[in-house]
Regions:
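Walker A/P-loop nucleotide-binding motif
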Residues: 124-146
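AAA+/P-loop NTPase substrate/partner-engagement loops
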Residues: 153-191
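A short, basic N-terminal segment
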Residues: 1-109, 268-284
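Walker B catalytic acidic pair
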Residues: 197-198
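N-terminal pre-Walker A segment at the start of P-loop NTPase domains
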Residues: 99-125
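Residue-level preference for the first positions of well-ordered beta-strands
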Residues: 129-133, 159-160, 192, 224
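A conserved segment at the C-terminal end of the G1
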Residues: 147-151
């Protein structure tokens, strides 16, 4: 089969599918021209010494196809982002946590900037297996900051899992057979793993083994993680229990520490709600 025979059915199909608008016209060169954008809808192919007229897309049709493709890609990304969010294990209350809604104060302004840099530079962070360790008292915004990073990445279709050590250990109680291996593989399918409340787990051999297994598997897979804890760096660095120190050694090797300070947002919010309710019930 020569080139002309090979192209014949393709050209014929293109001719059948070509839409001719009433405003279209024949140009001086004998080719069909679009009546809207005044660019050719046909061209001449030279095949085996023959000149064959074939349909092509005019400029406005090319732009239309490009828009349709962009719309399709956006819809697919939205669906993928929605699916990734549903698989992220993130509590629904954090789905709306974003850098734009982050309440910036003198206490957290620096950390906000660092978290934004981490999120926008995540391609480099994952290449370097670089994670973060958020330390600080209860209510200082550690989990919220981690959720902001998670949502930034999820919006860009980066797989993220966000859970807590307490939840992990609750599930681990029911692991049978190879369920733990499959669970860890699921954790490691995410580009970023965020685990809340390191140190809130019970100090049993079982609990600490599970915590170590999760962190060590992530470490060995060269995948970044963000951990939050109410422990201080001093407490972690001076841990004398070998069960803890081997966990913390892994963390310090791949996680950059950031301390969160300032008043507890939870206490501030509780005080605001109390005063709001007091005024409602008792009057100003």
């Amino acid at each position: 089969m020569d080139k002309q025979d090979f192209l014949a059915p393709i050209i014929e199909r293109a001719r059948r599918n070509q839409v001719v608008d009433p405003a279209d016209y024949i140009g001086d060169d004998g080719l069909l021209v679009c009546g809207k954008c005044n660019t050719p809808k046909e061209k001449i192919l030279h095949i085996n010494d023959d000149d064959i007229k074939v349909p092509v897309m005019c400029r406005c049709r090319e732009e239309e196809v490009k828009r349709e493709e962009e719309d399709r890609r956006r819809r697919e990304e939205m669906e993928r982002s929605k699916k990734l969010r549903s698989n992220s294990l993130m509590d629904g209350k954090f789905w709306e946590s974003t850098f734009d809604s982050f309440r910036c104060t003198k206490y957290n302004a620096r950390n906000l900037k660092l978290c934004q840099r981490y999120a926008t530079g995540f391609d480099e962070m994952i290449a370097k297996n670089q994670g973060l360790l958020f330390t600080g008292d209860v209510g200082t915004g550690k989990t919220y900051a981690a959720a902001c990073i998670a949502n930034y990445l999820l919006d860009r279709c980066v797989p993220v899992v966000m859970t807590s050590f307490v939840k992990i250990l609750e599930q681990a109680q029911n692991f049978r057979g190879d369920e733990e291996d499959r669970y860890i593989r699921r954790m490691n399918s995410a580009k970023l793993l965020i685990i809340d409340d390191l140190g809130a787990e019970r100090s049993t051999d079982f609990a600490l083994e599970k915590v170590y297994n999760i962190i060590d598997s992530r470490y060995r897979a060269s995948l970044p993680m963000i951990l939050t804890t109410n422990l201080t760096l001093k407490e972690m660095k001076e841990a004398t229990d070998i069960r803890y120190s081997r966990i913390y050694d892994r963390i310090f090797e791949v996680c950059y520490p950031m301390e969160f300070t300032g008043p507890s947002w939870r206490k501030v919010e509780a005080s605001r709600r109390f005063e709001e309710m007091r005024q409602f019930l008792e009057g100003p």
